[in-house]
Amino acid sequence: RVEVTPKQGDGMRDVRGDVIRRQLKADHNIDVGEVRSINGFLVKSDIEKSEIALRVDDLFSDPIIEDVLTDSLFLSSAEQFSKTPDAAITIGFKPGVTDNPGSAAYDGFRTIFSQHEDRIDATISTYHTYAFYGLPESVTSEWLASTLHNNLIQRAVISDSAACAAAQWPAIDFPEKPPQILTPPQRMDLEISNEALISLSESGLLALNLEEMQTIQSHYRDETVRQERAAVGIVA
């Protein structure tokens, strides 16, 4: 695990955190005192952790404007995060979802460790953590997380104010891909409620909204379509 966060001090800005803070104000009229961000990288490799740790500044961070930490959470560092946040949320990709920043980091990883041709194969997954300070009491961490991520392709780990006070920080694990099991086509019942249609879209990784699912539902309700399917032996 490698974490990177913008340095604090005069002239230093947390650009990603500022963007989130401004978006909450612009989109929801919610004033937040401060938002700090952390970029995370989960690296799976046969190369020794100690060797990777020596090159993190070359690969994962800009040491002039960023601090970096390996195999630990920045939120656990009293030096870097001396104030306890009101909420902390970590967002990462679900297993099997394309992680473009992770792919870019892997390209750099292969270049830096090109001397290890026998151990160069690696996988890198990325995530973002946001720490919120001065959060209005009316704003729940669950609602906040819902505005920060797309639950079709991303997952969120949340620490509310009580968890933060107890130093129970959100830590996301490497998104291991589930084993591929090929199954024959199955008949799906589309005569279901709107809630069940959304659940079907999410569980099947269809990435379709309710209107799109209802369009599919209406298509298969069409009598002409049902007759054409029956004519070629497909269950109506």
Question: Which residue stretches match the model-derived regions?
Answer:
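Core nucleic-acid recognition elements
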Residues: 1-236
